[in-house]
């Protein structure tokens, strides 16, 4: 008696979303971000708020913050990620984390800019180089928090919120082909296939492709920050961080589509740490104003705006590839 492998019925391509469905879906994103912002601006402020006479949210700059504050803030981020994943379901595995971090940007906005740290560095006996080194170390702390949040968020999504709707919505025809098993390596199709083939990166092993993708994404983000981050105003700083890592991740994804998303996300805090160390000897051109662009943002700015930008850039590249496939790799 022989057994045959069970087969599943092919999934037809879904009909395009109606205008009302798009509005409702994006309204859920807005609600998730607002709830996350309320959580971090109230409870999170009690954990990470700067001293009354200063400003700027930092895990290491102020002596009243320690590992306990970082641990509690991580737990709060995990809770916000779970709530946001529930609100935006069904969606991609990292949309809950993206909404939670965008809400966490409210904590950064409430905390103020890096101006107070610049003033502190200009006091007698102080050195901005030491402050920049501390901020670079803080970026590594945020990188650890990111790894914990990304891993927990992915496990939570796979356990409770796993779905294929986001793949079908990203590319109806190729998404259906991917889920039905008729095409392999669908994320490597279209523009991503053309770019990776032309650059010769298509068949790179992952242990080579991942570091190259991180270096390329970091270099592009550094260039975009140089162009976009022209002031220390918090809104402009957050927008510059989001746009820089969105563009860099999208472009590098097309060259390295097989590199997993954690590598692109880790590029954000590592790029910020490298930027702090690179500009640690920059002098203030005017009192309270830094001439080096990357030092106009705090680590929390890179974390709460840069990582959502990288997430949206990654999935924009995924969507672009699925929508523009005229050529596919051999099975």
Regions of interest found by a model, annotated:
Residues 2-78, 308, 327-328:
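N-terminal signal-anchor module of multipass membrane proteins
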Residues 42, 104-112, 219-223, 268-280:
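Aromatic-anchored segments of alpha-helical transmembrane domains
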Residues 25, 44-70, 88-94, 121-140, ...:
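Membrane-helix interface and helix-disruption motif detector
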Residues 24, 185-220, 224:
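Membrane-water interface at loop-to-transmembrane-helix junctions
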Residues 82-179, 197-199:
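Membrane-interface helix-loop-helix junctions at boundaries between adjacent transmembrane segments
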Residues 78-100, 251-266:
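Membrane-helix interface "capping/anchor" motifs
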């Amino acid at each position: 008696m022989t057994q045959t492998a069970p087969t599943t019925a092919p999934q037809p391509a879904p009909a395009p979303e109606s205008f009302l469905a798009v509005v409702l879906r994006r309204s859920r994103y807005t609600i998730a971000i607002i709830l996350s912002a309320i959580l971090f601006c109230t409870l999170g402020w009690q954990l990470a708020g700067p001293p009354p006479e200063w400003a700027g949210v930092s895990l290491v700059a102020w002596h009243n913050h320690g590992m306990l504050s970082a641990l509690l803030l991580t737990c709060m981020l995990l809770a916000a990620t779970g709530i946001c994943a529930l609100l935006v379901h069904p969606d991609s595995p990292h949309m809950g984390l993206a909404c939670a971090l965008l809400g966490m940007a409210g904590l950064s906005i409430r905390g103020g800019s890096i101006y107070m740290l610049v003033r502190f560095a200009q006091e007698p006996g102080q050195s901005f180089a030491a402050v920049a080194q501390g901020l670079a170390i803080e970026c590594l702390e945020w990188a650890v928090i990111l790894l914990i949040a990304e891993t927990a968020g992915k496990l939570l999504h796979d356990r409770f919120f796993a779905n294929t709707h986001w793949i079908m919505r990203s590319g109806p025809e190729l998404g259906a082909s991917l889920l039905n098993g008729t095409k392999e390596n669908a994320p490597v199709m279209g523009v991503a296939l053309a770019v990776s083939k032309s650059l010769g990166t298509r068949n790179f092993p992952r242990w080579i492709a991942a570091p190259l993708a991180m270096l390329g994404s970091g270099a592009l983000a550094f260039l975009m920050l140089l162009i976009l981050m022209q002031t220390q105003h918090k809104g402009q700083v957050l927008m510059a961080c989001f746009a820089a890592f969105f563009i860099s991740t999208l472009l590098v994804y097309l060259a390295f589509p097989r590199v997993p998303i954690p590598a692109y996300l880790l590029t954000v805090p590592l790029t910020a740490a490298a930027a702090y160390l690179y500009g640690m000897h920059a002098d203030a051109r005017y009192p309270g104003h830094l001439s080096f662009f990357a030092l106009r943002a705090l680590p929390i700015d890179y974390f709460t705006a840069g990582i959502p930008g990288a997430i949206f850039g990654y999935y924009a590249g995924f969507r672009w590839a699925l929508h523009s496939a005229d050529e596919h790799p051999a099975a």
